[in-house]
Amino acid sequence: MPRPSAGSHHSDKLHVKKGDTVVVLSGKHKGKTGKVLLALPRDQKVIVEGVNLVTKHVKPSASNPQGGIEQREGALHASKVSIVDPETGKATRIRKQIVDGKKVRVAVASGKVID
């Protein structure tokens, strides 16, 4: 098993999952909301729909004979996003609780179950 690098002091867990609606807390995309398309727990990054669009130059290939320039969502660090509270529509932290024998995520601000 490879040793973790010196700078990796995080666990492989994230507070967001694929499909969550999140808001960006900092950076040039601050305030934008979108759905999580992909969560990358080992890198502590998430890809959010419509946020942090980057330009990619794509070579022509068998599946894409035209090639060209396209816009794609880039990854954001997970600490820069927060889950949107389903009741208030604002950013909230989450807490984990056991409800009916299952561990669920609960919005701290409203107490509403998220999943």
Swiss-Prot record:
Keywords, comma-separated and alphabetical: Ribonucleoprotein, Ribosomal protein, RNA-binding, rRNA-binding
InterPro entries, sorted: KOW, Rib_uL2_dom2, Ribosomal_uL24, Ribosomal_uL24_CS, Ribosomal_uL24_KOW, Translation_prot_SH3-like_sf
SMART domains: KOW (SM00739)
GO terms for cellular component: ribonucleoprotein complex; ribosome
Superkingdom of origin: Bacteria
GO molecular function, one term: rRNA binding
Biological processes per GO annotation: translation
PANTHER family: MITOCHONDRIAL RIBOSOMAL PROTEIN L24
Record's function text: One of two assembly initiator proteins, it binds directly to the 5'-end of the 23S rRNA, where it nucleates assembly of the 50S subunit. One of the proteins that surrounds the polypeptide exit tunnel on the outside of the subunit.
Family affiliation: Belongs to the universal ribosomal protein uL24 family.
Subunit architecture: Part of the 50S ribosomal subunit.
Name of the protein this chain belongs to: Large ribosomal subunit protein uL24
Protein source organism: Deinococcus deserti (strain DSM 17065 / CIP 109153 / LMG 22923 / VCD115)
